[in-house]
């Protein structure tokens, strides 16, 4: 779905929004459904993998056996072209893990509906509301500091706890000025986390973190470039007065293990819609707890709300309050979770607790 405006972060531009709706039908009459993901380049391949490979693999299985079904998908012999899966083919591996994630999330929704409880209760039920922050501060054409300040005040009016603010597209000095002026406007009780989207060298990231220390920044997210994730993150972590976040691009618990042990991150923001679904995410959360690492989640509030509510070391659920940035969040669910006093409240209905708008699905369906 093409967006009305262009939204730019430290290293990218967003011009469209996509998602994948997955449904599982059981002989008990339960329909497990979930939506997530935003990969326009590979989404059709993900759909084909689910239909052509996972569907015949899973039909007839007990939907309650989520761990067994996850392993069955992960260890199956998948043919995604002219290469085998277990070679250095990151694109195909990513397709596999996103396909597993789509099926796995729908399975958990079915499981919650079967047992008549919300998914977060199945996962541990640590709290019934999670603090919520907006994703904003994008670089947009013609958008000056006044408009940026107004955007942040609008988030406060929406009762957001704070914002994840984009940095990294201009100089460190310019970004510090942007953040400092926003801090003046929103006050000290409004959370500001900064997201560089892998824009900086370690030295630039360290310079930003040191300069931003007086501004009470909750964390710096993905500060270094993709090819320097482990050593670069370690360097920033050791010299930054601000907690360091990474993990949204990792697709398995094994990559997250390396970020924790070698990258020494303070927080993991793994995306369950990319990294194998709920089953894999909860294993990553368990790993993180052993190292006193907190858990965040990259976007996708419809599933992250349940995950973060189920553990003691979960942080903020993230949403795009601007319908121009994420029209799917506003149009696809029939009703969205309530936001009140800086928190998003958990649904009380079984499963993931979000019914989908069939008219929207029909209008934008691509496959």
Show the residue positions of the predicted features:
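Structured beta-strand/loop patches that form or line metal/cofactor-binding pockets in enzymes
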Residues: 1-39, 324-330
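Metal- or metallocofactor-binding catalytic centers and their adjacent structured scaffolds
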Residues: 25-114
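Conserved, mostly hydrophobic/aromatic
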Residues: 29, 54, 103, 116, ...
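N-terminal small/glycine-rich loop or linker at the start of catalytic domains
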Residues: 118-140, 178, 185-189
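Active-site mouth loops of central-metabolism enzymes
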Residues: 130-147, 168, 196-201, 245
């Amino acid at each position: 779905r093409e967006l009305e405006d262009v939204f730019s972060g430290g290293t990218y531009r967003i011009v469209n929004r996509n998602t994948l709706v997955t449904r599982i039908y059981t002989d008990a009459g339960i329909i497990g459904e979930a939506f997530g993901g935003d990969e326009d380049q590979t989404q059709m391949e993900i759909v084909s993998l689910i239909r052509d490979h996972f569907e015949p693999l899973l039909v007839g299985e007990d939907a309650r056996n989520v761990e067994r079904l996850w392993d069955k998908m992960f260890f199956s012999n998948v043919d995604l072209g002219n290469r085998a899966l277990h070679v250095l083919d990151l694109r195909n591996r990513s397709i596999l893990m996103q396909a597993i994630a789509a099926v796995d999330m729908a399975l958990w929704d079915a499981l919650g509906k079967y047992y008549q409880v919300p998914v977060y209760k199945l996962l541990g039920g640590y709290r019934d509301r999670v603090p919520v922050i907006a994703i904003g501060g994008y670089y947009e054409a013609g958008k000056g500091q006044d408009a940026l300040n107004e955007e942040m005040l609008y988030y406060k009016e929406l009762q957001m706890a704070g914002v994840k603010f984009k940095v990294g597209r201009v100089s460190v000095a310019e970004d510090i000025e942007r953040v400092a002026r926003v801090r003046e406007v929103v006050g000290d009780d409004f959370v500001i986390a900064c997201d560089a989207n892998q824009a900086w060298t370690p030295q630039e990231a360290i310079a930003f973190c040191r300069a931003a220390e007086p501004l009470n920044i909750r964390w710096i997210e993905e500060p270094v470039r993709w090819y320097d994730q482990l050593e670069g993150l370690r360097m920033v972590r050791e010299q930054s007065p601000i907690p360091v976040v990474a993990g949204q691009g990792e697709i398995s618990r094994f990559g997250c293990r390396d970020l924790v042990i070698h990258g020494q991150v303070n927080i993991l923001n793994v995306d369950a819609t990319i990294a194998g679904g709920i089953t894999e995410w909860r294993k990553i959360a368990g790993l993180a707890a052993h190292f006193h690492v907190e858990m965040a989640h990259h976007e996708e509030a419809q599933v992250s709300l349940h995950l973060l509510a189920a553990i003691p070391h979960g942080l903020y659920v993230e949403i795009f309050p601007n319908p121009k940035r994420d029209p799917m969040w506003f149009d696809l669910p029939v009703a969205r979770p309530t936001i009140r006093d800086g928190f998003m409240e958990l649904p009380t209905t079984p499963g993931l607790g979000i019914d989908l708008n069939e008219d929207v699905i029909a209008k934008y369906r691509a496959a």
